[in-house]
Amino acid sequence: MGLPEYEADSEALLSQLTIEFTPGMTVSSLLAQVTTNDFHSAIEFFAAEKAVDIEGVHYNAYMQQIRKNPSLLRISVVAYAFHVSDMVAETMSYDVYEFLYKHYALFISNLVTRTLRFKELLLFCKQQFLEKMQASIVWAPELEQYLQVEGDAVAQGVSQLLYKMVTWVPTFVRGAVDWSVDAILVSFRKHFEKMVQEYVPMAHRVCSWLSQLWDKIVQWISQASETMGWFLDGCRDLMTWGIATLATCSALSLVEKLLVAMGFLVEPFGLSGIFLRTGVVAAACYNYGTNSKGFAEMMALLSLAANCVSTVIVGGFFPGEKDNAQSSPVILLEGLAGQMQNFCETTLVSVGKTCTAVNAISTCCGNLKALAGRILGMLRDFIWKTLGFETRFLADASLLFGEDVDGWLKAISDLRDQFIAKSYCSQDEMMQILVLLEKGRQMRKSGLSKGGISPAIINLILKGINDLEQLNRSCSVQGVRGVRKMPFTIFFQGKSRTGKSLLMSQVTKDFQDHYGLGGETVYSRNPCDQYWSGYRRQPFVLMDDFAAVVTEPSAEAQMINLISSAPYPLNMAGLEEKGICFDSQFVFVSTNFLEVSPEAKVRDDEAFKNRRHVIVQVSNDPAKAYDAANFASNQIYTILAWKDGRYNTVCVIEDYDELVAYLLTRSQQHAEEQEKNLANMMKSATFESHFKSLVEVLELGSMISAGFDIIRPEKLPSEAKEKRVLYSIPYNGEYCNALIDDNYNVTCWFGECVGNPEQLSKYSEKMLLGAYEFLLCSESLNVVIQAHLKEMVCPHHYDKELNFIGKIGETYYHNQMVSNIGSMQKWHRAILFGIGVLLGKEKEKTWYQVQVANVKQALYDMYTKEIRDWPMPIKVTCGIVLAAIGGSAFWKVFQQLVGSGNGPVLMGVAAGAFSAEPQSRKPNRFDMQQYRYNNVPLKRRVWADAQMSLDQSSVAIMSKCRANLVFGGTNLQIVMVPGRRFLACKHFFTHIKTKLRVEIVMDGRRYYHQFDPANIYDIPDSELVLYSHPSLEDVSHSCWDLFCWDPDKELPSVFGADFLSCKYNKFGGFYEAQYADIKVRTKKECLTIQSGNYVNKVSRYLEYEAPTIPEDCGSLVIAHIGGKHKIVGVHVAGIQGKIGCASLLPPLEPIAQAQGAEEYFDFLPAEENVSSGVAMVAGLKQGVYIPLPTKTALVETPSEWHLDTPCDKVPSILVPTDPRIPAQHEGYDPAKSGVSKYSQPMSALDPELLGEVANDVLELWHDCAVDWDDFGEVSLEEALNGCEGVEYMERIPLATSEGFPHILSRNGKEKGKRRFVQGDDCVVSLIPGTTVAKAYEELEASAHRFVPALVGIECPKDEKLPMRKVFDKPKTRCFTILPMEYNLVVRRKFLNFVRFIMANRHRLSCQVGINPYSMEWSRLAARMKEKGNDVLCCDYSSFDGLLSKQVMDVIASMINELCGGEDQLKNARRNLLMACCSRLAICKNTVWRVECGIPSGFPMTVIVNSIFNEILIRYHYKKLMREQQAPELMVQSFDKLIGLVTYGDDNLISVNAVVTPYFDGKKLKQSLAQGGVTITDGKDKTSLELPFRRLEECDFLKRTFVQRSSTIWDAPEDKASLWSQLHYVNCNNCEKEVAYLTNVVNVLRELYMHSPREATEFRRKVLKKVSWITSGDLPTLAQLQEFYEYQRQQGGADNNDTCDLLTSVDLLGPPLSFEKEAMHGCKVSEEIVTKNLAYYDFKRKGEDEVVFLFNTLYPQSSLPDGCHSVTWSQGSGRGGLPTQSWMSYNISRKDSNINKIIRTAVSSKKRVIFCARDNMVPVNIVALLCAVRNKLMPTAVSNATLVKVMENAKAFKFLPEEFNFAFSDV
């Protein structure tokens, strides 16, 4: 090592000076060496600016700053000398230049980082001097300013604790001779607890909780080794170092986090980082001398690894303010790869090797193992360059991890097992075989080219390739017939010489690369060849110059059968290829022709055109020259699609790479569609062998062997001369020969081969595969035997007579199998034995286990010996990499610790200790822990009980605005402010740094709240802070006037006031209200408020003489100002126990109410009927009236229409005056009783467990959202009108109520939302200037700032209820009408999320959108049955009122986490959701405050309830499992063990038998009851039990489960619901007969699902008993059957339109139009024409025109003169025409308003225009009838026209009867 070139005397001085360290040396002896003048001179020499950097030591900017400061440099050198003296185990002597330039510089440069800068160095120095000299270093202010750091204020005890831990751990690890992980961790735990007890006794109880962690760390080592499997058996040392390093580092970070939360540490300073960069590095240096080869490089590498670990671990526990570090093994490995990239670039370039950049590594590596493999490869190259030796372990590891050889071997083993179980390979399995084969060949090539790979690994790969090739040969010629996926077909079409063939070949190559397939996976098909010679189920089939020549059959005709999902046997030339079926996955075609040839003999051109999934029309760009090296450079690709009878251009692509991306995307979409289409068929499909009998197999063998000398007859026994050879295969050193005749008689013997071994081997393979295929696909083999094929094909289980001598399972199980085994025929056993020998099946071992066992010991011996000689730094670095990929158990616990926040365990210790001068009691560090374990409800006395002679106004203010905030033993007074905010004392709340679960106690109610310190807003020049959160209960906005917001204007200098406080009496257990008369002075001078280190100064305050006591802070000062009592100040401090000080109210901004609704309310002085969830707060002002339904719309039908069916349902009670109300329930009010369901919300849930459950659900959402990229808000137009053609984006219902307060402006005939929109009924928009439009704009502008004040109307639901809910105990359900603008904004923010949930119902629990008529019901049943036969069918009590704000806040966070977006959008989502849980409800003339539940009129009610339902079940599942100490793996396996589906409050829970001892109905019922949730049996609501039921006994959505076949389940509706439809009909929008007929059709359809026989009998009864219904009015059974067949092909929700389309006779005719131009409109007569608004702008009408707008939403007041808006109700079965009554009144009647306007216009020489949107047929008919009625058209013309109409559509058959005037002159 060279030295700086300085004066010779200085260099000589340094070379002679040494420093010596001995074990156990005293501090004085060390100081004697480092305090000499010579040593100080050496330090000055080291600090000289001209000094040259020594090789291997990097002097960063921070290091240079240390060298420039003599004091810091000397102190740090001495501190390092102290540190080294602790680490030596034997006497060591260093030259001073070596000590300074190498050891000290290396250590300090690692200690000083860019992130923490000098903090660790200063702490390190403090610790060393504190430990060795009991002296505390105080850094001078100028030094701190020079280093730009803040002084640390760490207690001595904590400093010593941390120092002891840092120095002890590596020392102990270094001294552990046997490297026992258990010994290291056990000792570490004991030492840790000892240090805590000695130095920080107050923290001992926290550490006792932490000590539970060490019990698990030992398990992580074993689990990691098991995870990595056979390969790491020989490198346990490496895994020990890796896991121990990560685990201890995490433990220390957790300790530090706890100490910070407890207030022992002011801020974190990276204890784990110090441990890694000092302890681990020092321990790794032991016995690795400084003169060793590569010492500097090794230590730099280890430091690099330590820095990466520290970044991940510290970043997990202490994330940055802006960048939240993602702590995971992926981040660790990516960081390590990036650091090694920079580190290795210079060291490896000399040998011609460079490391891949980290971004390239991340791109190329598809998984964690691949990334680790790349890193180990770099490490291998580094060792070769640095130390000069080759390591086979790293060479093997880089290959095994980089290529995931272990996963490759397991996949091969799985494929072989599947082949044994089925005797064939499916389409997907064949694809997997080819992918694995190509990967194996690539690994073989890579291993041989790189060198250094162990022979055992190479042989293992070769064995896998050989067995894959055998499996490929076996499966590629199979003829098993079954369902297959339709191939994805691409047609490259274009003119000749455009490069189509080249393009097709290149696309094929890119597809092969994408799927990892080799070049032999393509079959080039010549349509002229009648045979498919050489076809081996290749994934790709190419057809070049398709249809270029005429063939028979034609090329187009051949495509019909190829591009299908039906099995298609091919015509093969070779006998051995007989029966192969086509099942390639891709068919690529190049052709010059776009259309089908007339000579193709294809009867349906559409069938051919629909089989071309993508048409790529290839052309050349004339502006670009052809480039032979890049033929695609001048190509243009036009993507065509055949749709609606023509070719449509989808897009035009000019770049080849974009084309490939497009084709791959379409390919993936096609595959997903096929999987969905065939999912059920794949499960239930039976596959047929093309061999009808075993004789056919034997005949095939005879034909194969004909002409070849395969078998030598002389070697056959005499009795077997007439038999055929089945096989002759080698086994255990001899051959097993099996012969069989046509009667299946078998002769077997062991001996020599009976023919040519090589040829006979191929012959035997084909015969065995054919025979095995026939055996498994036939019914000959017992199904019990087929279920145990893995054991039955094992040759070790047979003796030489082929008798089965093995054992299946345990003895008791095997005994049950004996009869089945005995029933097997000998030819069965011969085939099973032979296939087992052929496939190398070994006893009780998979193929994977056999192969691994063959190499395991050899690798263990080799790796153990090699790793033993590695330098320790390499061991530690490599161990960290292995732990990152193998330590899954550690990482799981680590993520749980990181993700838990500070948790409730830390909540009570968050505040810290401070002075008692401000009169708030200091938070107790253990308050939250005490609360957590002693959660006993506190008794209290309400304020009205206190003996007070105070003015009632002051009491009312206290009741509305004062509250207490409670956590643990801390009880604070706060002031509630409108807008979900409160004011509180700054000196207390500034010390709360972590989230807390607190309780808010107000007058008459209390609730829990998750306090988040991030929502505290500092108020300058005030001792108050403002806290705001959406989940706080709001106080009435009328309370705003109860505060004095402008003290300068309103307050005099001296005034009288009331001092009011309400503190908790600990001894009495109640809140005690007190008051005092005070004289208040307004002070305008500085007041200093101190609390320990806390100091705050305010320039203005209120002062009064009052003997205030502790905990008075937060008390109210109320004065009579401006004619009313107001809060003028909040008590914040006291002076010497005599003078009180209050802070003036800050100038807050009021939060506007979007609805401005409270102007209609008269608020009560105090709330009434108070409960946990609701309270009556006001009444409606005089004259304010809310119109609600008072009479039912349900009409009872005549008795003969009841069809002798029972009915126990009647219309519900809507008004208190209903005479049906029983006498004992007199006074029952349905509107007010409806709000009572919100009176008792559920109890608060444990936030940690709730967060864990939310993360589980959120993870499922993210899994479903991989391909879902649209979660943004939709436009207002889309929120109103929906999106045409987009699933689950329907328009907003306009017929429903507009909500409060807009409902108050209704006129007599107006109703619903229609009056606030305008448009043509297809596309509408808000009418500007209306109350809804204004409220919408206000809500949009403010939703992100605060929770809107929501007012709903509770409206009794007009429905049929059981008689007991009317006559016995009235119980009418209510639904909530919410304001229109609120619903619109919610739809904008959440519509895409709702679409996502509904579209993924097949994967999620929420089943909103399910179609019970489709196969969805069958899939739901299969999903339940998959978990087992134990199903809980549950029913909640008052579910609508259970949801708490705590859970709603969590749901809002989940949705925001999934949907993302800007902060403004996230805040708006949260506020809109939270408004539901804290709103006002109008119940007739009273107003109630509701603080829980979901209003039924909320657009997302059913979605949110479904999510809440799922959270409840998941929460109590984990709670119950952990309470019973179930294995954690089961706790975390909800989705594996439980099948859950929800739909609002409806659910089904299928429970796996494994967890029934822990989780059943009884335990679930009890657990829910503890939280205030009542759940009962859904089938028997009176039962006290919640038993398991079979799925067939359960119901869901009032539908049961009836299994029709192995795959089809029906969902018949409860008959009681059906019969009630015959007794009562809703006549709101139609005549009674029409409504009844609609119900009859629905009942008929539902009865068909019960059974076709019942439907037939019901149909006949209807026709017999209801005389006016004809057979043509009812669908036939054939139509019903077709309806269900159609529905089972659908995936979307059912709707009435679909039902009408398939069951209504009137709609089965062809569509009607007068002419092709009729859809644009037509000329009816000279005076009357019709126009389609899609093509005509009525606003541009002429002065000589009169316009009628039919069924649009344009208000009449907004239309120009001469325009008239007409709306009708469509009649059922009338082809779109209005009801009979409407037509009679408006068309047939001559003096109707419409006819008058027409006649007036005609007399004025004006033209009349009838306008509508899209469907013009009804308007055309109305126009024609109007023309003939007003004598503008001859009757002969109208007669002929209408007759033609009726011929085309049966729906209009009623026209002659109703409009006789149009058919004859009357």
Curated annotation (Swiss-Prot):
Changing residue 920 to T: Decreased efficiency of cleavage between the putative helicase and VPg. Complete loss of infectivity. Residues 1429-1559 form the RdRp catalytic domain. SUPFAM superfamilies: DNA/RNA polymerases, Trypsin-like serine proteases. The keyword Chloroplast does not apply. GO terms for cellular component: host cell endoplasmic reticulum; host cell membrane; host cell perinuclear region of cytoplasm; membrane. The active site is at 987 (for picornain 3c-like protease activity), 1023 (for picornain 3c-like protease activity), 1113 (for picornain 3c-like protease activity). The record marks 326-327, 919-920, 947-948, 1155-1156 as: Cleavage. The modification O-(5'-phospho-RNA)-serine is found at residue 920. One of its GO terms (biological process) is DNA-templated transcription. It catalyses: RNA(n) + a ribonucleoside 5'-triphosphate = RNA(n+1) + diphosphate. Keywords: ATP-binding, Covalent protein-RNA linkage, Helicase, Host cytoplasm, Host endoplasmic reticulum, Host membrane, Hydrolase, Membrane, Nucleotide-binding, Nucleotidyltransferase, Phosphoprotein, Protease, RNA-directed RNA polymerase, Thiol protease, Transferase, Transmembrane, Transmembrane helix, Viral RNA replication. One of its GO terms (molecular function) is cysteine-type endopeptidase activity. The keyword Transmembrane applies. InterPro entries: DNA/RNA_pol_sf (IPR043502), Helic/Pol/Pept_Calicivir-typ (IPR004004), Helicase_SF3_ssDNA/RNA_vir (IPR000605), Helicase_SF3_ssRNA_vir (IPR014759), PCV_3C_PRO (IPR044067), Peptidase_C3A/C3B_picornavir (IPR000199), Peptidase_S1_PA (IPR009003), Peptidase_S1_PA_chymotrypsin (IPR043504). ATP binds at residues 494-501. This is RNA1 polyprotein. It comes from Cowpea mosaic virus (strain SB) (CPMV).
